[in-house]
């Protein structure tokens, strides 16, 4: 019997994990090992993928992968070491006891002035970035779905100028399964930080400790931060910190990163282990009596076999040994074993497999989880079921229910657009626009009264105020949209959207995980492109990158809002929703084309953790809104200001630098006139529109600024509603801004970036041409 056949609510014991390669290793690292107990929680609304519970946390996988996992059903779900009724262990005694958890014998003090470098390592969605912000005072983006951090970020620990801590992407093990996991592993192995801060989710401790064990094998000074201890204790759970420290051989500090509790103690221990280079006291977790000691003998034999090669390659010997046994190709390549040594390694491993009754990868994973189980039996009292889990299950009955998930998603998105463009955002935009107009009128009167030179007067009023001011008025709309997206992300809902939409996305050649970068793309294409690093398949990653620009970013909102308010008043929500849906539809058509041409093959397996729902943090939401508002203002007073001044200059002077009374005689008209024949079939045969669209390549917001400068507020009289509709469609689909193209170049290379820009311009031209043609027929 396979996991695919197990009924919802039923439990079973895993007997064998099929498949091969990185995916199988990832399943093992996530706890899907022979002997583990697994329970089917539910199926996605479309029947695939499925959600299962293993080692106390929720994991999603497709039915095709579940069909490769052989199981043996059990009558009743076990409750091993859950809700044990015994006296509560004493709380962690005091904060930062001087040297209590440190081994003086292992000290090797670094010279004064040495920069203490730290790697902040942990599972996805365990609170790493929140802790990083507390340690450094930084304001990195925080979310409640796996894969928020996709690149490493560094900062100095507050109060300790000779330190540098690097926030690495979340990983489940040191086996490279995706590009962000490779980033994390390479940093630890190659950059060789002075110490590791391993952050562990105390509410999901079994899975998190799997990575901890691999980090300990590396022999690097380390401190373990047990995060979310407030949630564990609040649910009547506890951890014997001192006993856990004794069994792991490193300092263990209970913290709540979100509340900044225990962070000072964590810093003191981290400084100590790095300054005095105290290695972990324990690296050997295999029991010589476990299953006849087969794994124990294998690991120690391989350690002796590869010891000299590991030292030459700069690899921790114990870590290299377990990875060599697992068959990690990157580690084996670095070890550079000769033919005889390779044969000896293979003989040792095969003998272990025969004695243990498991293949090499499963045997190593089982050894780690066996130690974790013993550790938790002795040190952890877990609540039967947390309030957060109970709450999540109740919410999921509606938001991921078979008949309610899709309607809920559509309803939520419609509500977001309605409130953004018709209610909250529109009201705030009107207020800000009135304020800018009043300030512009006051400035105009002041400059006139002072007798300022007409050229300067025109620059300030017709250039800066008309251009930059028109863009600034759309700030409330952008902030409002980001507010709602932040709520969805911070609550954990976006991860559910990926679960719900996986089967649908698979029909166009993508995985459900691709929904996360594409949803981020509605905010900004640049972080959306970076977020594709969480995808483990190069095929899926490239395909998703090429599709994210079709998700209309907030930088285009000023264009939509401007034309909708001028040409289609009272229909803002409808027009906006139509534009967003059109972008999604064109993206789907492009995906179907890519699927059968550039990216043949199957999408990656869908393996993802579903976090508990959490109440959005007011601090996190406010911080994100401030960052987005600040970024918008910086662009408005840098790129857009410069573009506005340049456009004003070029449309105000001719080639001889004489000021012109008619902008049709200006330098700008001459340059943009070259493009007029290209845009004429779209109903956009005006050099001023061509200029505005060109300026949009620098920043999409500058399209409105340029139009305001060139048309001088008379655009409604000079353009027809049909031309406005054509322009809206072209603006929706043509090449993203230069920052987005640069991010594509960074991820895929220059040829892909140029190709994407030209391809989107072609699609935009065709779509606008069709729009204009249909309009003429109506």
Which stretches of residues belong to each language-model region?
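Extended helical scaffolds that flank P-loop GTPase cores
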Residues: 249, 276, 282-452, 659-668
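Transmembrane helix-loop junctions at the membrane interface of multipass transporters and ion channels
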Residues: 550, 554-577, 739-749, 770-778
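Conserved G1/Walker A P-loop phosphate-binding module
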Residues: 91-173
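Extended, low-charge hydrophobic alpha-helical regions
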Residues: 355, 362-366, 382, 423-464, ...
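Juxtamembrane inter-helical linkers in multi-pass membrane proteins
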Residues: 434, 438-442, 495-525, 600-624, ...
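Canonical P-loop GTPase G-domain recognition
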Residues: 232-285
């Amino acid at each position: 019997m396979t996991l695919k056949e197990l009924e919802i609510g039923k439990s079973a014991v895993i007997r064998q994990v099929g498949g091969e390669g990185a995916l199988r290793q990832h399943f093992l690292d996530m706890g899907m090992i022979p002997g583990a107990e697994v329970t089917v929680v539910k199926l996605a609304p479309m029947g695939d993928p499925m959600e299962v519970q293993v080692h106390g946390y929720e994991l999603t996988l497709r039915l095709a992968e579940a069909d490769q996992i052989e199981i043996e059903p059990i009558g009743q779900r076990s409750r091993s070491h859950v809700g044990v009724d015994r006296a509560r262990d004493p709380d962690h005694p005091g904060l930062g006891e001087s040297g209590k958890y440190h081994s003086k014998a292992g000290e090797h003090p670094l010279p004064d002035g040495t920069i203490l470098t730290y790697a902040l390592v942990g599972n996805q969605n365990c609170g790493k970035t929140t802790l990083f912000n507390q340690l450094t005072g930084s304001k990195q983006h925080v979310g409640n779905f796996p894969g928020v951090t996709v690149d490493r970020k560094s900062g100095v620990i507050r109060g300790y100028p000779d330190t540098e801590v690097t926030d690495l992407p979340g990983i489940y093990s040191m086996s490279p399964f995706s590009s962000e996991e490779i980033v994390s592993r390479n940093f630890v192995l190659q950059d060789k930080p002075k110490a590791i801060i391993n952050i562990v989710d105390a509410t999901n401790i079994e899975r998190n400790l799997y990575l901890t064990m691999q980090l300990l094998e590396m022999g690097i000074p380390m401190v373990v931060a047990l995060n979310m201890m407030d949630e564990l204790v609040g649910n009547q759970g506890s951890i014997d910190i001192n006993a856990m420290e004794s069994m792991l051989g490193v300092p263990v500090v209970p913290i709540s990163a979100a509340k900044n509790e225990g962070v000072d103690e964590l810093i003191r221990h981290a400084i100590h282990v790095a300054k005095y280079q105290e290695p972990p006291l324990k690296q050997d977790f295999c029991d010589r009596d476990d299953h006849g000691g087969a794994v124990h003998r294998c690991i120690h034999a391989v350690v002796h076999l590869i010891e000299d090669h590991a030292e030459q390659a700069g690899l921790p010997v114990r870590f290299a040994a377990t990875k060599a046994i697992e068959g990690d190709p990157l580690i084996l390549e670095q070890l550079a074993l000769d033919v005889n040594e390779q044969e000896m390694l293979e003989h040792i491993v095969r003998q272990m497999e025969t004695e243990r009754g498991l293949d090499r990868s499963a045997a190593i994973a089982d050894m780690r989880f066996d130690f974790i189980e013993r550790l938790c039996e002795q040190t952890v009292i877990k609540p039967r079921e947390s309030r957060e889990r109970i709450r999540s299950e109740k919410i999921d009955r509606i938001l991921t229910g078979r008949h309610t998930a899709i309607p809920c998603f559509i309803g939520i998105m419609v509500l977001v657009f309605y409130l953004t463009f018709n209610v909250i955002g529109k009201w705030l935009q009107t207020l800000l626009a009135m304020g800018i107009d009043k300030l512009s009128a006051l400035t105009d009167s002041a400059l006139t009264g002072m007798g300022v030179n007409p050229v300067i007067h025109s620059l300030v009023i017709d250039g800066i105020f008309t251009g930059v001011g028109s863009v600034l008025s759309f700030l409330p709309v952008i902030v409002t949209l980001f507010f709602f997206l932040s709520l969805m992300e911070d609550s954990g809902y976006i991860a559910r959207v990926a679960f719900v939409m996986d089967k649908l996305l698979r029909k166009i050649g993508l995985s459900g995980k691709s929904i996360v970068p594409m949803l981020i793309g509605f905010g900004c294409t640049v972080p959306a492109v970076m977020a594709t690093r969480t995808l483990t398949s190069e095929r899926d990653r490239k395909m998703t990158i090429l599709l994210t620009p079709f998700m209309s970013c907030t930088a285009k909102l000023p264009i939509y809002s401007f034309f909708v308010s001028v040409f289609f008043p009272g229909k803002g929500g409808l027009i906006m929703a139509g534009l967003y849906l059109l972008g999604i539809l064109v993206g789907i058509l492009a995906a179907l084309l890519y699927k059968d041409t550039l990216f043949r093959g199957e999408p990656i397996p869908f393996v993802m953790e579903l976090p508990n729902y959490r109440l959005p943090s007011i601090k996190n939401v406010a911080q994100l809104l401030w960052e987005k508002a600040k970024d918008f203002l910086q662009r408005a007073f840098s790129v857009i200001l410069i573009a506005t001044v340049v456009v004003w200059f070029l449309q105000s002077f001719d080639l001889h630098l004489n000021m012109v009374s008619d902008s049709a005689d200006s330098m700008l008209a001459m340059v943009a006139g070259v493009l007029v024949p290209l845009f004429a079939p779209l109903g956009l045969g005006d050099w001023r529109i061509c200029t505005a669209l060109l300026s949009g390549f620098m920043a999409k917001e500058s399209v409105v600024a340029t139009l305001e400068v060139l048309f001088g507020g008379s655009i409604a009289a000079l353009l027809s509603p049909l031309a406005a509709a054509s322009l809206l469609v072209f603006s929706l689909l043509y090449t993203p801004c230069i920052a987005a193209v640069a991010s594509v170049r960074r991820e895929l290379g220059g040829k892909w970036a140029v190709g994407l820009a030209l391809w989107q311009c072609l699609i935009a031209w065709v779509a606008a041409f069709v729009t204009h043609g249909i309009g003429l027929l109506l």
